[in-house]
Amino acid sequence: MATAKVLLLDIGNRQLKTKLGDDRNAFDWHDAVALNSFEAYLRVSNFDILVYACSAPQAEAQVLDVINTYPSKKILAEHIALEIVSTNTGIDRLLTVFAASKIASTPVIVIDFGTAFTVDVVDAQNHFRGGAIGLGLGSQLSALAQAAPHLAPPSESNEIIPASTEAAVFDGTYRALAFAVRGLVEHYQVAGVENAAVFVCGGDAHRMHSLLPDYRFEDQLLFDGMQRVAADNWL
C-alpha cells in the first residue's frame, strides 16, 4: 500500500479534524448536523484507509458509528516509535512530540495550545518523559467571561503595566499563559534537556505567536505525527 491514499482523522475535545492530502476540514462532533456533514464528507472522499487518533474517549463510540463501514486503523501508543516512560498519556501529546522529534533530530519540548495546554518533553534518548497540562487559552477566556461577564474582552496594549481593563484581561490570560509555558520550558530544560528545540502547535497557537516569537510554530504537528505513524505501521 505504498501509494495508498490515507485519510487522517483527529477526534478531539471540540472537533473532528480531517486531513486528506492537502485538504483539511473540521466538524463539531457535539452537533448532529455537523456529524451528518462529516458522514457526507466521507462518502464523497477518495481514500484507501482511514487512520484515526482519539483524545476524546467520550466521543469515540459516536464517531465509530460513522466510520465503521470504512477500512480504518486506530493509532495507539504502541504504534509510536518512542520509549514512553510516563503513564496514561494522551495520544495527541505523543503524536505531536513524535513529529517534532523527527523534524528536529534533537531533544524537543512541545507546547500545544488546545482546549487544554500541554508542555511535553522528549529527551536525547528518545524517551517521552511527560510534561504539564493546564487550562487552555480559549477555555480560560470562556471561564472568565462566564464568571465575570462585566469585564471587557482582552486587547493587547503597548504599556508595560496595563491601565485599561481590556489590557489587564489580556495580560491576565494571554501574557500570563505565555509566561507560564516559558517558565515550564526553562524548568524542563534544567531537568536534563538543556538543548531541546521548542515547538508550538494547537488550535490557539496562532493567538500566542507574538508572545513567543523565539519558538518554532508548526501548526500541523499532530497530522505530521499521524502520517509518520501510519507510514511506519500500515503503509
Question: What would you call each of these model-derived segments?
Answer:
Residues 1-26, 100, 106-128, 144, ...:
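Gly/Thr-rich phosphate-binding beta-strand-loop-beta motif of the actin/hexokinase/Hsp70
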Residues 2, 81-108, 223-235:
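Conserved phosphate-binding catalytic cores of ATP/NTP-utilizing and phosphoryl-transfer enzymes
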Residues 24-27, 66-76, 86, 212-220:
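Active-site regions of enzymes building and remodeling cell-envelope glycoconjugates
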Residues 47-56, 73-75, 193-203:
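Short glycine-rich phosphate-binding loop at a beta-alpha junction
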Residues 107-111, 128-129, 150-159:
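Short, structured loop/turn "capping" segments at alpha-beta junctions
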Residues 134-191:
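Active-site rim beta-loop-alpha module in soluble metabolic enzymes
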Residues 194-235:
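Long hydrophobic alpha-helical segments typical of transmembrane helices together
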